[in-house]
Amino acid sequence: MGRTREAGCVAAGVVIGAGACYCVYRLAWGRDENEKIWDEDEESTDTSEIGVETVKGAKTSVGAGSGVKLQGDSKVKPEVNLGLEDCPGVKEKAHSGSHRGGGLEAKAKALFNTLKEQASAKAGKGARMGTITGNRTLAPSLPCPGGRGGGCHPTRSGSRAGGRASGKSKGKARSKSTRAPATTWPVRRGKFNFPYKIDDILSAPDLQKVLNILERTNDPFIQEVALVTLGNNAAYSFNQNAIRELGGVPIIAKLIKTKDPIIREKTYNALNNLSVNAENQGKIKTYISQVCDDTMVCRLDSAVQMAGLRLLTNMTVTNHYQHLLSYSFPDFFALLFLGNHFTKIQIMKLIINFTENPAMTRELVSCKVPSELISLFNKEWDREILLNILTLFENINDNIKNEGLASSRKEFSRSSLFFLFKESGVCVKKIKALANHNDLVVKVKVLKVLTKL
């Protein structure tokens, strides 16, 4: 702001000085007398310019222009020359005007116009000087992390427009760059006039309305609210039957194919509550393979994966539909090794359901498993994981004995579950090492398993 104001003062001073000179000429001297004065001025131009050049820049011209006094010829001459020091072509224009017949008046007008142009040029230069160091703007070519568009890397362009204005503009730019990154999935709207609360216990007509809304809408937010409402109502046995009789299972299950992980999670939760009912399991079995495939390929340890595992666990509590998932045994054991604490517990509950069905024993022990699975028999794991893995080993060992598979050991490869649990001997050593575990419950379970070997 200081440079712009200084340039404006210089321009104003030059214009005022030129106008004052012209007024002095018109009012104080006559035409003929001023012609003589101007001729004398032309003759002494060289000597006067030498004296004037020792004065510094525009500040001297401002002081001279604004401080004009009618004291004599010697005062007027340096004032005119000061205005001309940055524009050597002014004298030539004045001379050309006089030779054309305009006389001293034409010279003065030419001088006035030239000074005016010089002032405008100085003002423009000052404005440019004040705008070189400009605002910090967002570079559109550099993407902002997590954002959909624009950039967050500052570049210099534009005008400063003063200290306060530039401070405000910088503050706005910073506030834009600190916005939360846009999400991959559709943004959930905060308000929607849904006819019911998600925790309301609905009657059959109300459930029909919710199912109709879910069937007709493509809005992710409405789908989520409807699925949560149906899932909460499916926790009650009377509504489990009502939703099935209203044809709600296919309407809910069609959302398994959606790409939105939130919608898939809510879909699995609703189907999980419905699967507690045996008749509903007969409807859900159509989609169990699709649920299993999606659960195995989705992001590891995600909420969608946990919801899918819970649904598969409920569907395998009975022996009716376990054969539909036998092709996924290797994936289950791989997930048991790779998953986090909660995934390990949930997948072990699922596998234990298969071990309690003797008919599934051969397929189960013949599948390939990672050798690192033996690390689960380590005392560093907590009680729940140790109890589940010991139960898994106990059930498989009992089934091998009951089904007479011990004599068929040649049928199984060295990478199979049969070889890892029965033939390698490493598993038995690990279990014996747990006999001195600090947890009494784990110690009792270990002793029970060892007595059956």
Curated annotation (Swiss-Prot):
Pfam family, one: Arm_2
Main location: mitochondrion
SUPFAM superfamilies: ARM repeat
Mitochondrion outer membrane (MOM)-targeting sequence: annotated span: 1-6, 26-36
GO cellular component: mitochondrial outer membrane
Residue ranges of the region described as Disordered: 140-182
Membrane spanning stretches: 7-29
Domain of life according to the entry: Eukaryota
Biased composition, class Basic residues, residue ranges: 167-177
Keywords noted in UniProt: Membrane, Mitochondrion, Mitochondrion outer membrane, Repeat, Signal-anchor, Transmembrane, Transmembrane helix
Membrane side Mitochondrial intermembrane: residue ranges: 1-6
Cytoplasmic side: 30-453
Entry membrane topology: Single-pass membrane protein
ARM repeat locations: 195-235, 237-276, 358-398, 415-453
Compartments, record wording: Mitochondrion; Mitochondrion outer membrane
Alphabetical list of Gene3D superfamilies matching this protein: Leucine-rich Repeat Variant
Annotated InterPro entries: ARM-like (IPR011989), ARM-rpt_dom (IPR006911), ARM-type_fold (IPR016024), Armadillo (IPR000225), Armcx_regulator (IPR051303)
Role description: Regulates mitochondrial transport during axon regeneration. Increases the proportion of motile mitochondria by recruiting stationary mitochondria into the motile pool. Enhances mitochondria movement and neurite growth in both adult axons and embryonic neurons. Promotes neuronal survival and axon regeneration after nerve injury. May link mitochondria to the Trak1-kinesin motor complex via its interaction with MIRO1.
Assembly description: Interacts with MIRO1.
Name this protein carries in UniProt: Armadillo repeat-containing X-linked protein 1
